[in-house]
Amino acid sequence: MGTTMLAEPRTLTKAELAELLFERVGLNKREAKDIVDTFFEEIRDALARGDSVKLSGFGNFQVRDKPPRPGRNPKTGETIPIAARRVVTFHASQKLKSVVEQPNSPPDPASAE
């Protein structure tokens, strides 16, 4: 039986997003970089304030408080306290989930609007 070689997943970076804005929208490279940076700064700042971020058709980012809890050192078995903390969670939209479930289908250009 033959085996199917799956392509190694790649990582999309902020620099690549800026390059895509430059190519597809016609912004100059400086403007494209500034837009990408500002977009992520606004998301980061909102989450730092404890606000949720909803990106329609993509998903929701939320800040959640995790209470303190007992943990265990795996080497010694000793119980150690884990401090309370805030974490960011992401819940993908149904639209994003269905696109991800079809990894080989090209994205619908209309859904990018």
From Swiss-Prot:
Disordered: region residues: 59-80, 94-113
Organism listed in the record: Bordetella pertussis (strain Tohama I / ATCC BAA-589 / NCTC 13251)
Protein name per its UniProtKB record: Integration host factor subunit alpha
Family label: Belongs to the bacterial histone-like protein family.
Keywords, comma-separated and alphabetical: DNA recombination, DNA-binding, Transcription, Transcription regulation, Translation regulation
InterPro entries found in the cross-reference section: Hist_DNA-bd, Histone-like_DNA-bd_CS, IHF-like_DNA-bd_dom_sf, IHF_alpha
Gene designation: ihfA
Cited function: This protein is one of the two subunits of integration host factor, a specific DNA-binding protein that functions in genetic recombination as well as in transcriptional and translational control.
NCBIfam families: himA, PRK00285.1
Example GO biological process: positive regulation of metabolic process
HAMAP family found in the cross-reference section: IHF_alpha
PROSITE patterns: HISTONE_LIKE
Compositional bias annotation for Pro residues: 104-113
Molecular function, one GO term: structural constituent of chromatin
SUPFAM superfamilies: IHF-like DNA-binding proteins
Pfam family, one: Bac_DNA_binding
Complex and partners: Heterodimer of an alpha and a beta chain.
A single Gene Ontology CC term: cytosol
